[in-house]
Regions:
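N-terminal targeting signals for export/organelle localization
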Residues: 1-4, 44, 48, 100
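A short beta-strand-turn-helix
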Residues: 4-23
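Conserved acidic residues
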Residues: 8, 59-61
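CheY-like receiver
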Residues: 14-15, 66, 102
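Conserved helix-turn-beta segment immediately C-terminal to the redox Cys motif
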Residues: 20-22, 39-58
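Conserved redox-active cysteine motifs that mediate thiol-disulfide chemistry
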Residues: 27-41
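Structural micro-motif
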Residues: 64, 70-79
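Non-catalytic, surface beta->alpha helical segment in thiol-disulfide oxidoreductase systems
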Residues: 74, 80-107
Length: 107
């Protein structure tokens, strides 16, 4: 199981933009009910995909500039990056298998 990395403006380039692996960024906030409900699903995704991908989280309350830059309007938003570019987005509560399939499509 790979660890889920907290991303900030300071480490975004290193963790996401220049990463060779497919990277998923979970844009979330602590007050968002669906975000909280997705936490165990995201943990299961980490366990299922292991080191094949990099899984990250951005707390939009603490990192509003990242949310604004990527035009995040609805939480949670799962942005799938490949070669530093967003290749897919999933929004809202998403079943594990659907989120896993979306990520695996870019491996």
């Amino acid at each position: 199981m790979s660890a889920i990395i907290d991303v900030t403006s300071a480490n975004f380039k290193e963790v996401v933009a220049t990463n060779d692996k497919v990277t998923v960024v979970d844009f979330w906030a602590p007050w968002c009910g669906y975000c909280v409900r997705m936490m165990p699903v995201y943990d299961e995704l980490a366990a299922a995909l292991g080191d094949k991908v990099t899984l990250t989280k951005v707390n939009t309350d603490e990192q509003p500039q990242l949310a604004q830059f990527f035009k995040i309007e609805i939480l949670p938003t799962f942005a799938i990056f490949k070669n530093g570019e967003i290749v897919d987005r999933k929004i809202g509560f998403i079943p594990l298998e659907e989120l896993k399939a979306a990520v695996e499509a870019h491996l």
